[in-house]
């Protein structure tokens, strides 16, 4: 959020919270909540989500870390679900694209995960769960093997290694969706809601 005025332009943050059960055949009315704050600090979503229990699908912003139940020393009722769109984007950053041949491996495998999701979007929970177990789980295992094997051959400072470590450090949160029919592969619903609000 930009707030032009006198002198330097002030910036703020628009936090977006979305509920949309349509992809898993839920019947709750979709809803979007926008909260504006003058700064982007983790304490803001902590305040917004005080008392919330459940799954939070978000990007890798470090300010969210204190929200999650598995954070060191924290005992909250919020479980992290990471976003595959953010992870996939790492392989399309220009410094990583210079290693284009190696980037095809994860990009193709992540694309296959999205194909599984395309087939189950809007389907009943049991069908989504079965399809993910049959089709997504083996692809996740294959991708994890590729990431581990490739990382072991790279310089730790390479941009591709950084992209891989981003995903591996979030692996439990990235793969959580595959075991829960009510979760999505990414948080693109929030991205779409943000785009509608800012255009």
Annotate each predicted stretch with a short phrase.
Residues 1-199:
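Catalytic center-proximal scaffold of phosphoryl-transfer enzymes
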């Amino acid at each position: 959020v930009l707030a032009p005025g006198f002198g330097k332009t002030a910036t703020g943050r628009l936090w977006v919270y979305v509920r949309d059960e349509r992809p898993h055949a839920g019947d709750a009315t979709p809803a979007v909540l926008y909260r504006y704050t003058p700064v982007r600090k983790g304490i803001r979503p902590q305040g917004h989500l005080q008392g919330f229990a459940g799954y939070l699908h978000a990007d890798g912003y470090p300010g969210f870390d204190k929200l999650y139940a598995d954070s060191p020393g924290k005992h909250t009722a919020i479980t992290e679900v990471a976003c595959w769109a953010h992870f996939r984007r790492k392989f399309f950053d220009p410094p990583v694209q210079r290693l284009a041949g190696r980037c095809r491996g994860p990009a193709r495998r992540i694309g296959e995960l999205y194909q599984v999701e395309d087939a189950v979007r809007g389907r009943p929970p049991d069908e989504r769960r079965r399809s993910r177990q049959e089709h997504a789980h083996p692809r996740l295992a294959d991708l994890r093997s590729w990431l581990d094997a490739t990382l072991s051959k790279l310089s730790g400072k390479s941009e591709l290694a950084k992209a891989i470590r981003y995903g591996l450090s979030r692996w439990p949160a990235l793969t959580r969706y595959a075991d829960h029919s009510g979760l999505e592969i990414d948080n693109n619903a929030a991205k779409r809601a943000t785009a509608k609000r800012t255009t």
